[in-house]
């Protein structure tokens, strides 16, 4: 399995952006991904050293539109902590004059 198939997207919330100051990054990952697979994928894609990986399963929420009910998709979230000597991961694009 390719590393880019395991890491789906970064999670951008207030809590996850506060964790970035401590070199902890949050990603949505494949539902079947293990900690070892997430560690190897992050190290390969971003060229960093991973200290630890914490994974949690987030259940889908019940949603209603009128009388119809449904569920949002469940997901798997990984919080990846980098070593102190590792480079930061650039999730946001730098704002330059050409990027307006």
UniProtKB/Swiss-Prot annotation:
GO terms for biological process: translation. InterPro entries: Nucleotide-bd_a/b_plait_sf, Ribosomal_uL23-like, Ribosomal_uL23/eL15/eS24_sf. Disulfide bonds: none annotated. GO terms for cellular component: ribonucleoprotein complex; ribosome. Keywords: Ribonucleoprotein, Ribosomal protein, RNA-binding, rRNA-binding. Gene3D superfamilies: 3.30.70.330. GO terms for molecular function: rRNA binding; structural constituent of ribosome. One of the early assembly proteins it binds 23S rRNA. One of the proteins that surrounds the polypeptide exit tunnel on the outside of the ribosome. Forms the main docking site for trigger factor binding to the ribosome. Part of the 50S ribosomal subunit. Contacts protein L29, and trigger factor when it is bound to the ribosome. Belongs to the universal ribosomal protein uL23 family. NCBIfam families: PRK05738.2-4 (NF004363). This is Large ribosomal subunit protein uL23. It comes from Lactobacillus acidophilus (strain ATCC 700396 / NCK56 / N2 / NCFM). The gene is rplW.
């Amino acid at each position: 399995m390719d590393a880019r198939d395991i890491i789906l997207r970064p999670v951008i919330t207030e809590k996850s952006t506060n964790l970035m100051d401590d070199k902890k990054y949050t990603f949505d990952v494949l539902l079947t991904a293990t900690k070892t697979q997430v560690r190897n994928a992050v190290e390969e894609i971003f060229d960093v050293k991973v200290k630890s990986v914490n994974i949690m399963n987030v259940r889908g929420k019940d949603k209603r539109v009128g009388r119809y009910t449904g569920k949002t998709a469940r997901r798997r979230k990984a919080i990846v902590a980098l070593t102190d000597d590792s480079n930061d991961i650039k999730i946001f694009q730098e704002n330059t004059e050409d990027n307006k």
